[in-house]
């Protein structure tokens, strides 16, 4: 299992000591909104990590639409394509692909609260019939062998399970930080038993993005929206892996 960027920290529940709001005089109370932006804001108001909020529904440098479009370059996707977004959180990638291509998508995660949000957002976007979100760990996917044409992930996955559920000739698209500076995409492909089709080093972009998160965290701290401990936590985990030599790769691999 790859879990390289401490990407599970946002699943630690923060006590909800205040009523979720968008601003002065604007309150959601405790009711779920049928507005996409408001529903996401409700979710982020309950999260312990403010640094994830400005990622929006994609929650990760490797899961924004620009980067994801690069990863999908030359990928043939139709309404018949079956896609798994493993460790999907609120399902940003899965829902985006369903909306754009009309394909059937599945997402798995261990956080049922995140999956509730994913289902709510799929309903708001009128794509519920294309999306299925299930509670399951990456190392025990509840799917048959050779099920999916495409598996996508950002950081958290189990390579053996990915290979098992992929159809022969299917694609595994991974966008992830690898903290070992000596490891290469070719070596990773060999380790996972997959054929490397393409790779792109996006470390500079990821570093700049996470540096911006540090600046944002300082502004939040100055505005008394986060405490000193949270600020230090964000600063320690944003760019440190990159300054220590970590590399961020986009890779597309194929099951032989």
Features from the language model and the residues they span:
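Conserved glycine-rich SAM-binding loop
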Residues: 89
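A short glycine-rich, Lys/Arg-flanked "PGG" loop and its adjoining helix->strand segment in the class I
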Residues: 159-171
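A short acidic, Gly/Pro-enriched loop at the edge of an enzyme's catalytic core
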Residues: 139-150
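Conserved Class I S-adenosyl-L-methionine
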Residues: 202-256
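Conserved class I S-adenosyl-L-methionine
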Residues: 7-76
């Amino acid at each position: 299992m790859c879990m390289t960027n401490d990407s599970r920290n946002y699943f630690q529940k923060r006590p909800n000591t205040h009523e979720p709001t968008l601003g002065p005089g604007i309150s959601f109370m405790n009711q779920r909104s049928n507005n996409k932006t408001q529903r996401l804001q409700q979710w982020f108001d309950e999260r312990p990590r403010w640094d994830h909020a400005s990622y929006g529904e994609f929650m990760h440098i490797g899961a924004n639409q620009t980067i994801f479009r690069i990863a999908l370059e030359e990928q043939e996707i139709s309404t018949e394509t079956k896609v798994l977004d493993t460790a999907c959180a609120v399902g940003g990638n899965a829902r985006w692909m369903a909306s754009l291509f009309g394909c059937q998508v599945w997402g798995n995660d261990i956080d049922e609260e995140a999956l509730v949000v994913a289902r709510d957002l799929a309903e708001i976007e009128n794509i519920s019939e294309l999306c299925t979100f299930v509670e399951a760990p990456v190392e025990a996917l509840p799917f048959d062998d050779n099920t999916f044409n495409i598996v996508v992930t950002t950081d958290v996955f189990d390579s053996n399970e990915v290979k098992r559920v992929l159809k022969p000739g299917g694609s595994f698209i991974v966008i992830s930080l690898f903290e070992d500076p000596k490891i290469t995409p070719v070596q990773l492909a060999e380790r996972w038993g997959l054929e490397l089709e393409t790779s792109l080093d996006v470390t500079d972009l990821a570093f700049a993005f996470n540096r911006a998160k540090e600046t944002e965290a300082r502004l939040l701290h100055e505005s008394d929206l986060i405490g000193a401990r949270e600020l230090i936590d964000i600063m320690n985990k944003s760019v440190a892996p990159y300054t220590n030599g970590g590399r961020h790769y986009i890779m597309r691999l194929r099951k032989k």
